[in-house]
């Protein structure tokens, strides 16, 4: 069992007049990001005025893009993510808004020297397009297929069918499974005062058995749940 802390510049939600993402040189920000991985995460999330390193080191670089758009600041964040990865070997996780802009994200990261085999594109299941997925996977990227137990978005059955098609097409080594469950309603312990709720364990207790029933082999499921995360998130630590 493990928890991986991430450091992030996610989407264009930073004030272009005063935020450090907007006003500080890319190389200087990348140096700060590297220190979060090698030395420890800042207690104040670099909000200043001082930096106090904690004992906890980041193990994931995160950036994000907008819906059908990558703003100038988001492009800068992607380049910084690539620079940080080059120095540390840490994986990059990209928030895509409704799965859009995947090819353009990979273009920017590749041009900045990122390792696309350690680059995870998240939320792509929002755009259920097998041709689109294959275009991203054929460039070496990793896709995180998420949002089981969210019937207001799509049924679990539809999500399972997407995964079965990708596994059958030979991409099982480039797939991760997740819940996108950072909000309160996705956490059983937080919802306990209200009653019984499905938590993050739904992925293993309910969705994984459905994948087996769908015809995905136990070895392919283990690949997506165990071996792929171990490979993608591995890095040399001092």
List the predicted regions and their residue ranges.
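Divalent metal-coordination and catalytic microenvironments
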Residues: 85, 143, 180, 221, ...
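Mid-to-C-terminal alpha-helical segments outside catalytic/metal-binding sites
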Residues: 201-238
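Single conserved hydrophobic/aromatic residue that forms the stacking wall/gate
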Residues: 1-10
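Active-site beta-loop-alpha junctions enriched in small/polar residues
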Residues: 11-14, 66, 97-99, 124-127, ...
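Short amphipathic alpha-helices and their capping/turn segments at secondary-structure boundaries
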Residues: 31-53, 160-172
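Divalent metal-binding pocket/active-site signature
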Residues: 44-128
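Short acidic/histidine-rich active-site segments
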Residues: 146-147, 171-194, 221
């Amino acid at each position: 069992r493990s928890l991986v802390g991430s450091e992030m510049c996610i989407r264009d939600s930073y004030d272009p007049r005063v935020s450090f993402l907007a006003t500080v040189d890319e190389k200087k920000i990348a140096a700060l990001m590297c220190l979060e991985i090698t030395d420890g995460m800042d207690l104040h999330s670099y909000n200043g005025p001082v930096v106090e390193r904690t004992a906890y080191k980041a193990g994931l670089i995160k950036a994000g893009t907008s819906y059908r758009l990558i703003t100038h600041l988001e492009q800068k964040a992607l380049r910084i993510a690539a620079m940080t990865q080059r120095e540390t070997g840490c994986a990059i996780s990209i928030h895509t808004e409704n799965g859009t802009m995947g090819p353009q994200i990979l273009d920017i990261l590749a041009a900045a020297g990122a390792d696309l085999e350690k680059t995870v594109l998240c939320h792509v299941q929002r755009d259920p397009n097998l041709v689109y997925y294959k275009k991203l996977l054929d460039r070496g990227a990793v896709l995180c297929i998420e949002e089981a137990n969210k019937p207001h978005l799509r049924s679990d059955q539809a999500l399972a069918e997407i995964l079965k098609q990708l596994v059958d097409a030979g991409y099982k080594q480039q797939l991760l499974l997740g819940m996108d469950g950072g909000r309160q309603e996705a956490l059983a312990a937080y919802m306990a005062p209200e009653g019984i709720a499905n938590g993050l364990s739904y992925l293993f207790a309910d969705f994984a058995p459905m994948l087996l029933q769908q015809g995905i082999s136990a070895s392919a499921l283990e690949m997506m749940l165990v071996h792929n995360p171990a490979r993608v998130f591995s890095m040399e630590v001092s």
